[in-house]
A protein has these predicted regions:
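Positively charged n-region of N-terminal signal peptides that target proteins for export
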Residues: 1-4
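Bacterial N-terminal signal peptides
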Residues: 8-16
Length: 269
């Protein structure tokens, strides 16, 4: 759906410059967007874009974007209003704050028509109260779908648990209070799951938040101290703390393999 944008005001407020828009945009709401900059705001009418320079702050509801430079490209509609279609933020550190989460990078691009955002740069990071996600290449977010994708050496840490993979994909849903909560987490490629008790590896994994069960597939290995379980598929029930390993075509004879060393596991205190 094309988001309509109307220019409400463009004026100078020393020592900052301010511009206010009304559009469904950064946070998927109809609240107005306010852009302030320490140095200047430029309106390039021929090229059809706005540019804010130095210490830029974009605020819409509970969502805030901070950067050094921001450009907003727009198209003119038939009724002479302006539809912003692409927002680009750059700087040594670009920060997006939404509710209790913060994302960090060096460049962020938001495609308004697609409700799609991508963040790139060094030290990509997403921090929330109970977990942290890092990636080497990109952090992608689909606003309407509630999907987050971390690409390239992706790592998610929560308490004492860590999951690593080439790509991590998190899907969210709204709870009864209208707050987005985790629905599922997919790990794709070179998966390593580390807990205080064991290390699990495989080609891919899926965690279902509703059932609290994780499934690891292809070339699966569970290592606890010196003991090793190998199979084609593993299920880990985090409710009962019971893990099941299954054989398959990737295993010799389709059998599960386990190697155990007596006395290698410390007894619970």
């Amino acid at each position: 759906m094309i988001r309509r944008i109307f220019l409400i005001a463009l004026f100078c407020v020393m020592p900052c410059y301010k511009i206010v828009f009304a559009q469904q945009n950064l946070s998927g709401s109809d609240r107005p967007i306010e852009i302030t900059a320490k140095e200047s705001l430029e309106w390039h009418r021929n090229e059809k874009f706005f540019q804010a320079n130095v210490d830029v702050r974009v605020v819409q509801g509970e969502t805030t974007l901070l950067s050094e430079v921001l450009t907003a490209k727009y198209r003119e509609s038939e009724n002479n209003s302006m539809d912003i279609h692409t927002i680009t933020a750059t700087g040594a550190i670009v920060q997006i704050v939404m509710q209790e989460s913060k994302a960090f990078g060096q460049k962020a691009v938001y495609e308004v028509d697609k409700a799609y955002a991508v963040m790139t740069g060094d030290n990509l990071k997403l921090i929330s109260p109970d977990q942290q996600v890092t990636a080497r290449d990109e952090l992608q977010y689909w606003v309407d779908q509630g999907r987050l994708k971390a690409v390239g050496n992706a790592v998610a840490i929560r308490a004492d648990d860590k999951i690593e993979a080439d790509t991590l994909i998190a899907d969210f849903k709204e709870d009864k209070n209208g707050k987005r909560v985790l629905k599922s987490l997919q790990a794709v490629g070179n998966v390593v799951i580390t807990t205080p008790e064991e290390i699990l590896t495989g080609n891919n994994a899926v965690y279902n938040a509703d059932t609290n069960i994780a499934e690891i597939n292809e070339n699966v290995k569970i290592t606890k101290d010196q003991n090793v379980l190998e199979g084609s598929k593993a299920e880990v029930d985090l409710n009962t703390n019971i893990s099941k390993m299954y054989g398959g075509v990737t295993q010799e004879g389709g059998r599960v393999r386990g190697v155990f060393y007596p006395g290698s596991v410390e007894k619970p205190k």
